[in-house]
Regions:
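Short cysteine clusters
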Residues: 38-44, 84, 131-137, 141, ...
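Cys/His-rich microdomains that often coordinate metals
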Residues: 48, 138, 145
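Ferredoxin-like iron-sulfur electron-transfer modules
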Residues: 29-35, 76, 113-133, 144-166
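Redox cofactor-anchoring modules in respiratory/redox and cofactor-processing assemblies
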Residues: 1-123
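The C-terminal cap of the DNA-recognition helix in HTH/winged-HTH DNA-binding domains
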Residues: 80, 142-143
Length: 166
């Protein structure tokens, strides 16, 4: 209802708690802008694609510092050259993210997300001190991504695990 009353590109300030990942929220925000893009303005159309993909890479642990530099350069150009508010809004958001949340970006570049929101950056393991070696974890894993059994500490297969937390 709020998105219909107050479109996301109108300057309304959104607040987030410390438990929400600002990088993930930025990726979702740019995704919404990308979906609304009419495609007429080259800088908006192509810039939204590049920034959205860059933020997706960042939340997936695939981005490099050079990607962040490229997104900043692109955002600077988008702010000047976009003919509509969508491109200018995305540019402002990206520049603001880099200016005010640089630590969050660095954290994601290092493969961590302190909110545990970005699943690709969360790594599960079975604590040997807590494991009783009774196979309980093996039975409870819906993806059968845990190898173990009686008198063995379970080991999680990162490729099979969908990070459900069960």
């Amino acid at each position: 209802v709020l998105d219909e009353t107050f479109p996301i590109e109108n300057g309304v300030i959104e607040t987030y708690s410390d438990e929400e990942c600002i990088v993930k929220k930025a990726e979702e925000f740019v995704g919404k802008l990308r979906a609304k893009c009419c495609g007429k303005c080259v800088f908006c159309r192509e810039g939204l694609v590049q920034i959205h993909e860059g933020l997706k890479d960042l939340t997936a642990g695939k981005a490099k510092i050079t990607d962040i530099d490229l997104m900043k350069e692109l955002a600077d150009i988008m702010r000047q050259q976009s003919n509509c508010s969508l491109g200018q809004t995305a540019a402002g958001m990206m520049l603001g993210l880099q200016e005010y949340f640089a630590d969050d970006i660095k954290e994601h570049l290092a493969g961590r997300c302190h909110t545990l929101t970005c699943k690709a950056l969360v790594h599960y393991y079975i604590d040997p001190k807590m494991c009783k070696g009774d196979g309980h974890c093996v039975e409870n894993c819906p993806k059968k991504a845990i190898d173990g059994g009686k008198d063995f500490v379970g080991v999680i297969d990162e490729f099979e695990c969908d990070k459900c937390g069960k």
